[in-house]
Structures are given as structure tokens and as C-alpha cells.
């Protein structure tokens, strides 16, 4: 971890560090703060007092391991114990016990929590920081209206505004406003104190009318006036102490609580010296805010930029968990209070153990992790996805914005994001700009602000000092951006460098620079930092790339990228996908599922992950990397995980690519591939699907798991064992029974078949009254059974049913319809798989693996893929791997092109292949048509880029419908694969059919296959008897629906069918 004042070269911080620090802060500080707030509870007669002794709380080590929690669908949590005392005031006796108040879910080494067997992660939220903010708006006359908005700690807003006559009003709700003099008087000041504490007393006196003097003549009158406006009550309220307490509680304490951060911001903005423990709005704050508002009216002071990061705060894991803990303690307080009163009423002797229950705390955290918008299921598609998910920042959530109401200005990039929030990595769609990602070196400061590190440049000292600066501090410094010293301190700096000062980007002399960047990747997130040559790409395509890398499927045979950025190893290390040695030792035993490490006189067993399913059905598997007998150092890699090779992230494959059109099969971003990628398992991936069934205890008896299922073919039951569960290693097809289950049911006498009634009457044989409710393999689920789990919950009641889970492994080769993508936003769908002999081939005889469309490069402006493509070819011929930092043009102009050309030239020399680098068209080569053997007319760019296979696979998306459910209102087929829905024929599809004149097909689409109820019923019968399908004689249901909707608007629409019989054409001869 980097701290202030570190000397020398920095290291990249742990990518999960933000989550770890937040949870540790909650355990160390948040728990204690909330426990100290727990009040002393007395009964109604004030004879018994209950209190908690915070100093002695303890968290117990979990009884189960992480793996067992996932396996048994339990929560990986720690039990919280606190000392509590019960004091009898009459006798001064005290009974003290250590009580269990609930379970707190713990964070594991990945920065996630396991709740009910599911990995969940808490997202950091960006909120407007509490304090006061001044802005200016134009009214309908074009005159500036100045407003000061006071934001409380929980997000409530109150406004101060100044009108054209320099009168100041306080707006406590959208509709009601009162004079600031009334508000100040209600808060306890008289007129003399108000005028003594403001800078412009004459302005306050100028709008003081006789009516106003009467309102503020006494504190009681001011409170009544304010209460009438604030509570919006009619009539004349009467002053009382209860009214005063209610106003104090509802407004001055709840609505205007600034909190620790708000008090600090208010003091800084208004130059106040109020102590930090005064977290509520005071009369001094109101008067100082009014003074500043008057100054703005007369051209003094500055307005606030609400989108600047200095005016934002991060609501981290610690804050969210602490809020939930406080909520649970409030519920616990109500429970204890009610239990004490009940015990006294029934003349029972309470004990601390009897008064406290663990339900409030446990249920509060379970509902938080299960229902809160900022608690999400961890995306585990690949190792990169796990890290990036924990570093997200969201403007959404409770107290934040919504995708529908957020403006463009909020979504846009701000200069204060520099080095703190990645300008590239955000979601696409309605949440663009609202969900961001932390920059690599950013950290959350003590006051909830995002801090970024810089090197301080000082003429006095030769050493280098690192500073972490908040957004409000670094705007006062000249910050040099992207200079060469970020990597090599020995290079002599240029005379003029680009710099940032007060949210402006300037070009200044090196002597004027105060701070400089510490790393070229400092401004980007992890996803964007893994894109080589990102400086040559359009930002929109880089955004797509950083999102698509998270969708890459781990392949069965992973491969390191030839061209990378150098962060691949750190990303793999922090993802938790690797097995790392925790200490030195010697490997004494290895197996597919564990490693035994001997050292310090004992043996450490390190379990490996074997064919574990992620929540995106991808396969997580660790492969051994150390032989038996090898000596291991601490931190050494013992096993590679999914999508890692040699400890580096490996999401895709280096394949030979040509950029050229090919018979139209790669138009509109389609991709043509060679069958070699299929037969040699280049892009083969494993996927694990989970199928589960539960056995309940019904009112007719318990459900039974068995292999004796009547009325089912023996072929469907062939894979079941004697218990009725599918056997491990079985190959199952669609429709096979995975778990045989019978459910008892009550059958009426009249519903028996005749032969069943005869058997009962003559022989007295009891006919089975069970129905089969087996778990069957759905369509597209064929594969190999790799695991079966029978989870039996304690108790075995109907509320805790037994669960049987079957895991099936599928091997998926790449096929037509799958989605592939590069690292530069170049994505496409496989359109055709060609035989190797038909693919274009190079001058050395090698056939190309993929053919991309060259028209996808110029308009998208992602030229980085061309640099990567050519450099990858050179690296494959020279057997080299390149790790290139972004913005290499800071060393010299055209640095990227010079590097690529020099490597291609060297590859051409070493391999004696002049076609690798031809001076007439460098980077291109003449290639041949595999079908004819003739060369193509133009030279073509060929290379070896890194191509990913994405999770969007055709096996999960392909769907067909013959018949199914219809919507109740429109009578049209439902939408979506999950609902067995139909294919929508929209407006543009109808135009296309009209353009080709296919009238009968169009009529079928709009009637029989859609919402013509009578016609679609007749289709089946006429098809069976072989007759012609009759034409529909009335309007479809959607048209009738339109007519009914028009009738609701008092518009009558009559319609009739025009046929050949009653349709006459009167035509006159010319």
C-alpha cells in the first residue's frame, strides 16, 4: 500500500484493496461507533436498566469454511458477542452476561461475501457530499437568481435564495418559503443577535417590515410561523413545548443533520470554526450562508461546480455495512424494550440473555445482501470480471440518481476525474456515465473523497516524494501529464510539457511544474489498461473493448497474448484464480485436487479448484504447475486457474487474421473462420450447467425420490442409480430423467380409469395415487454428469426442503452464430466455417484462421488493432512477447509505427521471408485464394491479434417456436426464449416483405401466426386433413384492440371486409 511521503518508484496497489480497506474500517471503527450509540433502556417504572458494554465485544472465527458455505448454500459469517448488563435500580444489583446478538457476513480473500452460498459484492456509491453549494439560474426575465442549497448527510435539501430586492428566503419544501429572519428567530436568535452576526446588517434591515417585526418579536411567534409553513397546517396553531420538540426533532435534527463530512465542508466553504462534533445546522451556518449569498448577488465570491469530485463523496462498503448495523441495533432496541415491559407485566425475572435475540441483526444483513441495489451477485465469467466488478462506482442506488433523470452533464467526463475515475470504462445504454470504474492508483480517503498519487517536483531536494491528493487540492498545482519521467527518471525532460491547472489543460515550461504523474496507466481502469495501443483507438471503441473483455469465456487451452500491456500478471494474481504458496517448503505430493507442501516441521494441504461452476456457467478449474519434489518460495504460483497461463491473464488466442472481403461472408462485421479452430479445439470452452429439484413434505405425505417411476420408458431412466439420482459420469441427452421423484396426491373416485376402478372393486388392489414430478434435462442441456449433491438441511421440515443438484459439463466448440471480439472494440458474429483448403493462404503456405472486414476499421477509428495485428505477426515469427505501455508517442513521434515496422523488418531478416516486410506496402502482403490458387489483386494486412470468444453463444440464444402462449390483451405470441415466445415482425420487417411482394407470407405473419384467434385455430385442422387454409374473414385481434382504445377516447371506427363479390370497379374508357 502506498502512503504519503514514500520515496522512489511506486508499485501498483492491490486491485481488491478498496474492498479490504472498507471492510476492515467497518470492523475496527464502524461496529464500535454504532454500539456506542445504543442507548440505556429502562422499563416504564424505571426500575430496570439494560445496557451494552461496548469495550468487550468479540467476533468469533466462522465454524465453516468458504467452500462448505458455497456447497451447502450457507452464509460465511462470524458470530458477534457483546457483554450486556441488567441493573436493578432499587437494590443496585447488576447481572452481566456475554450475549450473542447476531451474525455478520465476512469478506473473503476475493473482496466478496458468501450469502446463502452465493458470492455477492458491494459496489461503492458516489453521492453529493453534504454541505452548501451555490449556483445561479436565469429567471423568465433573464435575470440571475442565486441559490444556496444545503444538503444534509442523508440527502435532504433545503435552499436559501435571494430575490431581485435582495430579500433572502429559506425554502424548506418545494412550495413553501419563509424569511431567513423567521428561520433564525425560530432557531433561537433575536434581532439584535442576528444583526451582530452578519456582514450586511443594513440589507437585513431593509426588508424588515412591520409584519416581519411582529413575526420575529418573540421566539414563540417565530416558531409558530415556521411550524405553520414547514408542517403545512391550516388555522392558527398554539405554541407548546411538544410543538417545539417536534420541530426540533423533525427539522433541525433529522432534516438538517450535516454529519462529520458535512460539518467539515460547511466550515471550509463559509470560513467557520465550529467544532466537528456539532453535526447539526446552527444559526451561525444560516447567517454565514446568507452573507455569502449577498456577496454573490453583488459580484463577490464564486459559484460551485456540483459535478466536481471535491463536491462528491464515496459511500464505501464500510458506510453501507455500518448503516445496516445501526438499523439492526434500532430494531434490537425496540425488541429489548418490548421484552422488558412484557417480563415486568407477567412478573418474570429477565436476564440479558433472555432480552436479546439475534433475529434483527441476522435478518437485516440477509435482506441487505439480498435486496439492496448496491449488493450484487459477483460476476464470475472470467478472472478479470471478478476484479473489475469490485472496483465499480455507481451514481445509482438509494440517495443517488436514476438512469431516467440523470442529465448529460452528470454523465460527462470531468477534469477532476483525472487519475481517479477512468474516462473510458463505463457501461453502455441507459446507465452510460452513471456506472464508472476506479482508476488503478485511486484510493478512498479518510473523508470519503477519491485520492490520486503524484510525484512532487522540488528544486531543493533530489529525492522523489509521493503525495496522495484529494480533488480539491490538486487543482492548485501545475500537474504534468503523460511525461516520460513516469517510466524513466533518467531521461532529460523536454522544455515544454502538457499540464493541468485549475481544470484547464495547458502547455507550460518544465520549471513551472509542481507535480507529475507516477505511471502511464494512472488514468485508466484495469479493463482499459489491458488494451495495447489504446491511444490509437476512438474512446467509444475502447469502452466497448473494456466491457467485452469481461465477457470473454475461459478456453480449454489458454494462451498468453503476444502483445500486451504488462498488467496481465497483476490482474491474474489479484483475481484469486491462481493457487499461491503461502510459505516456503517442498512439494511432497501432488494430485488433481490438492498439493501437499512440507516445511517448518509440518505439512500444509492446499486444495485446488476442480471443475467449479461460476454463476455464468463457465468452468473454473486449476491446473497444476509444480512437480513433486520441487522447492517452493513464498508467493510462487502453484497452479494456474481458468484463463491464466504462467500466472498471466489469458482470455483469448493469438490467431492468424487477414483483413479482406470474402464473398460477402464478412460484411457488416461478420467473421469468416477456418475449420482448424474447430477441429484443433482452438476456441473450445467448457460450460457447467446446474439443475436442481427440491423434495417437500406435502399435506398428503413426503415426496419420494426413487428410480421406480411408472408410465415412463426404461430408456429415459437408464442413468438412474438405486436411489433414483443420475449416476456420475453418465452422458445425458435432452429429455432424460436426472432425478426420479413421485409426489403424492388425492385422486377422486370419478377420475380413476375404468380398469383401476375394476381392480379396486374385485381384488381390493390400491392403485398408486402419485404423480411423477421428475427433474428432466431441458433442450440444449446434453452433456456429462460431473457432480451430484444431495443437500439435507437440519430439521428436514417442509420449511427446510432437501435439495438435489446435478451438474452437467458441456464441451462447446466454436460454431456459426458465436460472437468473437478483439481488444479494440472490433466484434463480430461467425458467419461461415470454411475448410482449411478454401481459406486464403500466405506465401509460406499457412492458411489464415480468420477473415475480418477491412471496412470495420476506418469508420470506427480503432487503428490500434492494426498495430497489434502486425506486431503480433512479428512476435510469433521471432518467438517474442511484447508488453507496451500506452502513449508511447511521448518518447518520439510515430513511435508505435516505428516499433511495429522495425520488428517486422527484423522478423523478415531472421526468417528469410521477404513477404513479412515489403517496403512498397509495409505491414501488408500478397496472399492467395485457397479455392483457385491465384493471388488476390491487392496486398492484404495479415497478422496475429489476440481474439476472444465471448459469452454470447448461439447455443444459449437459438430458439424456435411452433406453438405456445399468447398475451391476454393483444393475443399475440409472448416475447423471449424463456417464455417460448415468437419472433416479432416489426414495422421495418413488414416493409421488407412488402418490397419483395410476398403478399401471402405477409398475410400469414399478420394473421395466422400472430393474433387472428379464429384463423389460427382452423390452421391445425385443415393441415391435418390436407385441405387449403381458409382466408381470414374478419379483423385480427390487434385491430379490434385499436378500435376499442379509440372508443375509450369517444372515437367510433367502423370497418368492413372488402371481397371480390361486393367490390366493383367503375372504369371509363379514355
From Swiss-Prot:
Which coarse location class describes where this protein primarily resides?
plastid
Enzyme Commission identifier(s): 2.7.7.6
Q: What keywords would UniProt list here? A: Chloroplast, DNA-directed RNA polymerase, Nucleotidyltransferase, Plastid, Transcription, Transferase
Q: Which Pfam families match?
A: RNA_pol_Rpb2_2, RNA_pol_Rpb2_3, RNA_pol_Rpb2_6, RNA_pol_Rpb2_7
Taken from the UniProt entry, a GO cellular component term is: DNA-directed RNA polymerase complex
Q: Where in the cell is it found?
A: Plastid, Chloroplast
Reactions mediated catalytically: RNA(n) + a ribonucleoside 5'-triphosphate = RNA(n+1) + diphosphate
Q: Which GO terms describe its molecular function?
A: DNA binding; DNA-directed RNA polymerase activity; ribonucleoside binding
**Which biological process terms from the Gene Ontology are attached to this UniProt entry?**
DNA-templated transcription
Enzyme category, top tier: transferase
Extract the InterPro entries matched here: DNA-dir_RNA_pol_bsu_ext_1_sf, DNA-dir_RNA_pol_su2, DNA-dir_RNAP_su2_dom, DNA-dir_RNAP_su2_hyb_sf, RNA_pol_bsu_bac, RNA_pol_bsu_CS, RNA_pol_Rpb2_2, RNA_pol_Rpb2_2_sf
Q: Which family does the UniProt entry place this protein in? A: Belongs to the RNA polymerase beta chain family.
Entry function? DNA-dependent RNA polymerase catalyzes the transcription of DNA into RNA using the four ribonucleoside triphosphates as substrates.
Relate the assembly described in the record: In plastids the minimal PEP RNA polymerase catalytic core is composed of four subunits: alpha, beta, beta', and beta''. When a (nuclear-encoded) sigma factor is associated with the core the holoenzyme is formed, which can initiate transcription.
Tell me what this protein is called. DNA-directed RNA polymerase subunit beta
Per the UniProt record, the lineage of the source organism begins with: Eukaryota, Viridiplantae, Streptophyta, Embryophyta, Tracheophyta
Amino acid at each position: 500500500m502506498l502512503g504519503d511521503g514514500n520515496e522512489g518508484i511506486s508499485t501498483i496497489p492491490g486491485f481488491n484493496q478498496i474492498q479490504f480497506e472498507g471492510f476492515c474500517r467497518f470492523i475496527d471503527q464502524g461496529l464500535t461507533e454504532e454500539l456506542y450509540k445504543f442507548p440505556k433502556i429502562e422499563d416504564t417504572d424505571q426500575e430496570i436498566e439494560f445496557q451494552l458494554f461496548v469495550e468487550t465485544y468479540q467476533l468469533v472465527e466462522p465454524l465453516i469454511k468458504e467452500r462448505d458455505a458455497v456447497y451447502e448454500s450457507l452464509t460465511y459469517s462470524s458470530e458477534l458477542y457483546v457483554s450486556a448488563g441488567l441493573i436493578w435500580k432499587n437494590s443496585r444489583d447488576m447481572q452481566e452476561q456475554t450475549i450473542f446478538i447476531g451474525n455478520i457476513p465476512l469478506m473473503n480473500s476475493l473482496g466478496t461475501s458468501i450469502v446463502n452460498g452465493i458470492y455477492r459484492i458491494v459496489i461503492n456509491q458516489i453521492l453529493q457530499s453534504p454541505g452548501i453549494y451555490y449556483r445561479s439560474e436565469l429567471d423568465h426575465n433573464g435575470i440571475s437568481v442565486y441559490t444556496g442549497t444545503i444538503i444534509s448527510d442523508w440527502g435532504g435539501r433545503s435552499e436559501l435564495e435571494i430575490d431581485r430586492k435582495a430579500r433572502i428566503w429559506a425554502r424548506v419544501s418545494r412550495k413553501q418559503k419563509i424569511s431567513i429572519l423567521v428561520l433564525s428567530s425560530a432557531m433561537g436568535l433575536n434581532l439584535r443577535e442576528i444583526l451582530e452576526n452578519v456582514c450586511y446588517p443594513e440589507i437585513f434591515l431593509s426588508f424588515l417590515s412591520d409584519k416581519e417585526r411582529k413575526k420575529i418579536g418573540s421566539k414563540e411567534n417565530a416558531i409558530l410561523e415556521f411550524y405553520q409553513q414547514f408542517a403545512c397546517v391550516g388555522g392558527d396553531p398554539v405554541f407548546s413545548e411538544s410543538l417545539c420538540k417536534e420541530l426540533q426533532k423533525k427539522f433541525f435534527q433529522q432534516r438538517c443533520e450535516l454529519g462529520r463530512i458535512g460539518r467539515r465542508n460547511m466550515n471550509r466553504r463559509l470560513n467557520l470554526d465550529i467544532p466537528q462534533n456539532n453535526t447539526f445546522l446552527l444559526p451561525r451556518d444560516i447567517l454565514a450562508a446568507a452573507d455569502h449569498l449577498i456577496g454573490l448577488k453583488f459580484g463577490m465570491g464564486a459559484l460551485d461546480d456540483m459535478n466536481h469530485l471535491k463536491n462528491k463523496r464515496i459511500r464505501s462498503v464500510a458506510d453501507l455495512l455500518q448503516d445496516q448495523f445501526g438499523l439492526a441495533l434500532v430494531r434490537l432496541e425496540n425488541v429489548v424494550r418490548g421484552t422488558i415491559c412484557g417480563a415486568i407485566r407477567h412478573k418474570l425475572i429477565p436476564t440479558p440473555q433472555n432480552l436479546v435475540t439475534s433475529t434483527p441483526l441476522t435478518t437485516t444483513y440477509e435482506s441487505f445482501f439480498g435486496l439492496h441495489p448496491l449488493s450484487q451477485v459477483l460476476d464470475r465469467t472470467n478472472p478479470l470480471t471478478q476484479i473489475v466488478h469490485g472496483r465499480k462506482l455507481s451514481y445509482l442506488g438509494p440517495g443517488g440518481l436514476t438512469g431516467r433523470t440523470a442529465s448529460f452533464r452528470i454523465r460527462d467526463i470531468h477534469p477532476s476525474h483525472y487519475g481517479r475515475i477512468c474516462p473510458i470504462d463505463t457501461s453502455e445504454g441507459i446507465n452510460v456515465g452513471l456506472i464508472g470504474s476506479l482508476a488503478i492508483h485511486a484510493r478512498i480517503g479518510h473523508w470519503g473523497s477519491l485520492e490520486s498519487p503524484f510525484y512532487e517536483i522540488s528544486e531543493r531536494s533530489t529525492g522523489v516524494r509521493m503525495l496522495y491528493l484529494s480533488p480539491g487540492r490538486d487543482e492548485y498545482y501545475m500537474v504534468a501529464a503523460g511525461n516520460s519521467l513516469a517510466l524513466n527518471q533518467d531521461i532529460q525532460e523536454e522544455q515544454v510539457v502538457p499540464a493541468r491547472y485549475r481544470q484547464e489543460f495547458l502547455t507550460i515550461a518544465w520549471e513551472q511544474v509542481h507535480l507529475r504523474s507516477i505511471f502511464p496507466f494512472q488514468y485508466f481502469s484495469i479493463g482499459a489498461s489491458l488494451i495495447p495501443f489504446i491511444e490509437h483507438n476512438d474512446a467509444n471503441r475502447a469502452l466497448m473493448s473494456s466491457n467485452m473483455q469481461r465477457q470473454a469465456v475461459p478456453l480449454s487451452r489458454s494462451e498468453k497474448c503476444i502483445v500486451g500491456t504488462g498488467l496481465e500478471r497483476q490482474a491474474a494474481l489479484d483475481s484469486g484464480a491462481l493457487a499461491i504458496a503461502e510459505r516456503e517448503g517442498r512439494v511432497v505430493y501432488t494430485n488433481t485436487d490438492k498439493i501437499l507442501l512440507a516445511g517448518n516441521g509440518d505439512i500444509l494441504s492446499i486444495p485446488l479448484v476442480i471443475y467449479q461452476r461460476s454463476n455464468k456457467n463457465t468452468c473454473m478449474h486449476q491446473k497444476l504447475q509444480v512437480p513433486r519434489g520441487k522447492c517452493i518460495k513464498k508467493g510462487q504460483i502453484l497452479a494456474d486457474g481458468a484463463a491464466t497461463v504462467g500466472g498471466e491473464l489469458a482470455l483469448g488466442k493469438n490467431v492468424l487474421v487477414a483483413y479482406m472481403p470474402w464473398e460477402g461472408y464478412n460484411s457488416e462485421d461478420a467473421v469468416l473462420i477456418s475449420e482448424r479452430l474447430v477441429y484443433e479445439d482452438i476456441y473450445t470452452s467448457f460450460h457447467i450447467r446446474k439443475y436442481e429439484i427440491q423434495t417437500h413434505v406435502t399435506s398428503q405425505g413426503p415426496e419420494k425420490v426413487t428410480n421406480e417411476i411408472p408410465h415412463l420408458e426404461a430408456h429415459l431412466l437408464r442413468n438412474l442409480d438405486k436411489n433414483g439420482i443420475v449416476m456420475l459420469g453418465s452422458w445425458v441427452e435432452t429429455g432424460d430423467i436426472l432425478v426420479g421423484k413421485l409426489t403424492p396426491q388425492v385422486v377422486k373416485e370419478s377420475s380413476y380409469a375404468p380398469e383401476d376402478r375394476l381392480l379396486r372393486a374385485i381384488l381390493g388392489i390400491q392403485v398408486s395415487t402419485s404423480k411423477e414430478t421428475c427433474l428432466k434435462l431441458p433442450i440444449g442441456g446434453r452433456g456429462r454428469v460431473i457432480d451430484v449433491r444431495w443437500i439435507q438441511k437440519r430439521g428436514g421440515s417442509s420449511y427446510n426442503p432437501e435439495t438435489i443438484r446435478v451438474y452437467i459439463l458441456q464441451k462447446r466448440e466454436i460454431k456459426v452464430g458465436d460472437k468473437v471480439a478483439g481488444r479494440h472494440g472490433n466484434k463480430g458474429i461467425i458467419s461461415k466455417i470454411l475448410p482449411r483448403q478454401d481459406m486464403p493462404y500466405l506465401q509460406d503456405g499457412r492458411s489464415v484462421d480468420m477473415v475480418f472486414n477491412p471496412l470495420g476499421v476506418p469508420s470506427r477509428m480503432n487503428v490500434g488493432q492494426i498495430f497489434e495485428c502486425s506486431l503480433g505477426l512479428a512476435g510469433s515469427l521471432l518467438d517474442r512477447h511484447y508488453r507496451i505501455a500506452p502513449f508511447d508517442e511521448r518518447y518520439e513521434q510515430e513511435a508505435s509505427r516505428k516499433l511495429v515496422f522495425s520488428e517486422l523488418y527484423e522478423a523478415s531478416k531472421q526468417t528469410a521471408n521477404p513477404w513479412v516486410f515489403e517496403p512498397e506496402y509495409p505491414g501488408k502482403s500478397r496472399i492467395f485464394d485457397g479455392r483457385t490458387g491465384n493471388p488476390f489483386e491487392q496486398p492484404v494486412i495479415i497478422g496475429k491479434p489476440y481474439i476472444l470468444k465471448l459469452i454470447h453463444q448461439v447455443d444459449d440464444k437459438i430458439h424456435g417456436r411452433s406453438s405456445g402462449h399468447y398475451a391476454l390483451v393483444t393475443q399475440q405470441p409472448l416475447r423471449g426464449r424463456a417464455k417460448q415466445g415468437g419472433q416479432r415482425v416489426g414495422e421495418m420487417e413488414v416493409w421488407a416483405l412488402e418490397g419483395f411482394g410476398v403478399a401471402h407470407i405477409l398475410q400469414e405473419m399478420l394473421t395466422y401466426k400472430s393474433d387472428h384467434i379464429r384463423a389460427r385455430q382452423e390452421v391445425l385442422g385443415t393441415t391435418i386433413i390436407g385441405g387449403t387454409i381458409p382466408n381470414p374473414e374478419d379483423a385480427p385481434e390487434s385491430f379490434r384492440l385499436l378500435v376499442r382504445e379509440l372508443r375509450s377516447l369517444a372515437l367510433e371506427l367502423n370497418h368492413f371486409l372488402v371481397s371480390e363479390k361486393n367490390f366493383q370497379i367503375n372504369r371509363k374508357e379514355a
